[in-house]
């Protein structure tokens, strides 16, 4: 498949075995605003629930509404991602499959989250900035290019792509169903 940039490195740790519950993990979607992270994550959550998983979705917009004073500087973003990562790790420890969708632009903070989790699966939604801008229903990229939004990832603030994600998906030209299938196939051990 041309949109899947790398094959999974090892057998998936979460596939359900003959009548047993899906093992908990932290499935961490990262990528630019408008890349498709949250949309795919919501579909994956739905599919995991249908398979009987105890699953929780942690999303960037939702979490920022809970922590409204979180800023967009590098240090504020790092602190926020580590806070969410701690929560994700605790949920996983208590048997919950966590699906997280955050821009999470810095490798160091994503690596810190990985260290807090038993099974961390990084999904890099690698959709190019040009496609993300084309999809931008909220007009955030336009505002960022006009200087009305500072520290906007991909425009005035960097995005550090993962070096070794478990899965990378460029959603350009893909349907949500196709993208979701790539993730579910990975999780269920189908290559």
Residue ranges and their predicted role:
Residues 126-129, 134-182, 189-190:
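Small-molecule kinase domains that catalyze NTP-dependent phosphoryl transfer to phosphate-bearing small molecules
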Residues 66, 70-71, 88-145, 151:
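ATP-dependent NMP and nucleoside kinases share a basic, alpha-helical "lid"
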Residues 42-89, 93:
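Conserved substrate/cofactor phosphate-moiety recognition/catalytic segment
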Residues 33:
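The conserved Walker
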Residues 1-26:
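Extreme N-terminal, non-catalytic leader segments
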Residues 37:
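Conserved lysine of the Walker
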Residues 29:
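Hydrophobic anchor at the beta1->P-loop junction of P-loop NTPases
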Residues 57, 120-122, 166-168:
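Conserved beta-strand scaffold positions in the cores of enzyme catalytic domains, especially
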